[in-house]
Structures are given as C-alpha cells and as structure tokens.
Amino acid sequence: MKHAVASLAMLFAVALMAGCATQEGPATTRPDESLVNTYWKLTALDGESPDVVDGQREPHFVLHADPARVMGSTGCNRMMGNYRLEASTLRFMALSSTRMACPHGASIERRFLAALNATTAWRIEGERLWLLDAQHETLARFEAVHLQ
C-alpha cells in the first residue's frame, strides 16, 4: 500500500510539473519580402559593409512594377533605369545617374553600379536580398526597409 501511495504521489508530481511547462508553438519565420515595390538598403558590397557618409543618402533601390523601372540612390547620386525580371533571373538595363560631385562615396557608387550591371540572378530569404552574378556569387546584399 505504501508503494502504491508513493507511486501515486510521484505520478501527481510529474503531472503537475508537466502542466506548468511552457509550450512552444511551431517556429515562425518571416515570409520572404517581395522583390518588387520594396525599399532595398545596401548592407554589403563585395563582402564589405559600405560606409554611410554624413549628409548623403544611403545606397538603396526600389524596383517598380509597371513600368519595370528601378530607382534609388548610389549614396551620392540618384539613379534610375530599367530592369527585366523572369523567375530567378534579374537584369538591370540602361542605368543612369545624376552627376553631383560628392567628395566621399565615389568608390561605393562606382562599385554599386558595377554590381547592378553584373547582376544576373537574385535570392531572397526573409528580409534579405542577394544580387548574384552569372556564377551565382554574391555581388551585393540588401535589407528590406519598411517606410512608415
């Protein structure tokens, strides 16, 4: 009888502890951002974080759907052009920019435009975008920014 009471007490204690445990739901991941109509802020170029220069805009772009236009900033100048998107391929075409003289940021601007011109593919995971070259090597990485 003592054995039965001890077993019953132990079973009650285990049930009580199980009831107090927190349950975790399934892991939630953020859905992938849309490539089009999203503000993409440059976070890495040639594997390095770009320097943001005081008084200049951050390098970024937005792909607009109709017509298929790209607009953004190189960090120094405004840029614009066209793009063609087919499944996982992306090509920027006829890119142009304003020609303001900026004492800082010319190197980033040149490399940013070169990366856009070399882009052939893209990949999005959550709020991050990678622009890839023909060998699927990363040219630039971006982060989605939600404007209020």
Task: Cite the ranges covered by each PLM segment.
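Lipid interaction determinants
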Residues: 2-9, 18-148
